[in-house]
Amino acid sequence: MISLLKGIDVPMGFKLSTVALCAASVVLLSGCGDKAPEKVEVADYVATNRGYVKSPEVTSVAVTAAGELLVTGGALPEARVRLTSPSGQAYGVTAGSDGRFQASLPQMSGGSFYDLAMETEGRLMRAEGRLFVPPASDIGAPPRSVLLRPGASALPLWPQAGLIAVVDYDAGGAMAVSGRTDPGIMVDVEIDGQPALEVRSGENGVYTAALPVRGGLRSGTVTIGIRARDRFETRQVSLRQPSAERATLMGVAWYVDWAISGGGLQTTVVF
């Protein structure tokens, strides 16, 4: 079991929980700060008069000439979209008639975190995870942005992501990996030089794999190998036991320690 998801039984291997979370009331902060807070009902997935509605998503992140983050994504047509920083500052935009939205957001020192949600019929529908963007200044290259997902592998959002783009692990001994390759091909995964499993990449070329780590994870390092057709890549991951939320650059990789609902920390390593 993934021990960090307290109170919810989740199978080992970063399988997304199918347990429905109870609706709650939260206070939304207005982007300009001159409106009184409003209460809306929160739900991960809701049934509306349009049928079951897909949660909002981030599709790309770029850096503007002013040094801000230009976040592009999809939501319901003309829905009100909110991106909220850990401090509670919210930035609101309205999606177009095609559901596409863009928002310019300030960067934070040490890496930027934003929670994405949209309002629909008086409810706040949250995205599948939290956006993390390492500090970036090159307007000609997309930053190594990822969607952090509790109890699952993070999703790489930048188009130049490698075969091994992200590795996730937690104190309960679960580990997962994701990356980008050609669409619809088989991907072979190795752990410390030993074959582990085979998965298929999606239509966008992104694959995710929950790794069968026998005996759990211990302090030290683990080597992940990925083979896709004639390409092969390995990465070493340092296993740590974080005690607080933070993002740390170690060599070429960002180690992002972040809190998940129910308590505990999950570590996402962005290469």
Give each language-model segment a name.
Residues 2-271:
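Serine/threonine-biased, Pro/acidic-interspersed low-complexity stretches characteristic
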